[in-house]
Amino acid sequence: MEAAFRYRMATRLARRLREAGRPLPLPALGEALGLRGPVERVVRPLLDGRFLLEEGVGLWEWRYPFPLEGEAVVVLDLETTGLAPGLDEVIEVGLLRLEGGRRLPFQSLVRPSRPPSPFVERLTGIPREALEEAPSLEEVLEKAYPLLADATLVIHNAAFDLGFLRPALEGLGYRLENPVVDSLRLARRGLPGLRRYGLDALSEVLELPRRTCHRALEDVERTLAVVHEVYYMLTSGRPRTLWE
């Protein structure tokens, strides 16, 4: 069975259990895949680390949360005018702090020194007029930085975003010393065998809603959805912090 298809079917089973809010027997899960009759040979191989097998099939996420109690996680994404730190600029910052069952979102457009290209406007859906009225990167980071305190950062393809973020924070006199988890690398561990590990490819495999444009907070939510699935695949009933 192709890896992408297997992960897609397993995620449908996890979604069915979340809808039910309780453990279900294998035949009921088979129905979620459109199967009838004996289904164990098909369903059981799909049950990865997310699933708890007792009386029926449940989910480990019902036993322990992500992130764990006492752990703070910040999922972060930047939108930029291009791929080259030092030449290109940040035009949007989005992040979501998760701690103690609370969600603290932050999003802001950023005014660049020169307008983005028409390609970037189409890609992000951010009109240059909106950027002209946005605060500077320094102003945005002064507001965002306190939300990073004592948190593990989760960033998809982290080296790219950090190439913009670290120099900007250092220019303000801040050092970014948080532990960083690259969700792209995490996905490679939890979802081996895929051809691509970009957010679009992972979202397709996990059947997340398609994005209409590249916006920071939308990509933060998609990254979080991917990491949530992969975290339980990898921990499989052995709770630990994301950084571990």
Predicted regions and their residues:
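Charged low-complexity interaction tracts in eukaryotic proteins
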Residues: 1-9, 36-70
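Acidic two-metal-ion nuclease catalytic site recognized across multiple nuclease folds
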Residues: 2-8, 12, 24, 60-61, ...
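Short amphipathic alpha-helical elements of helix-turn-helix/winged-helix folds
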Residues: 12-20
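Short acidic, hydrophobic short linear motifs in intrinsically disordered regions
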Residues: 22-33
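Conserved non-catalytic scaffold segment of RNase H-like nuclease domains
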Residues: 61-63, 69-166, 170-178, 192-196, ...
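Short, glycine/acidic-enriched loop or turn micro-motifs at the edges of active sites
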Residues: 80-82, 185, 222
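A short, structured active-site edge motif that brings together acidic residues
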Residues: 178-188
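Acidic, divalent-metal-coordinating active-site segment for phosphoryl/phosphodiester hydrolysis
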Residues: 215-228
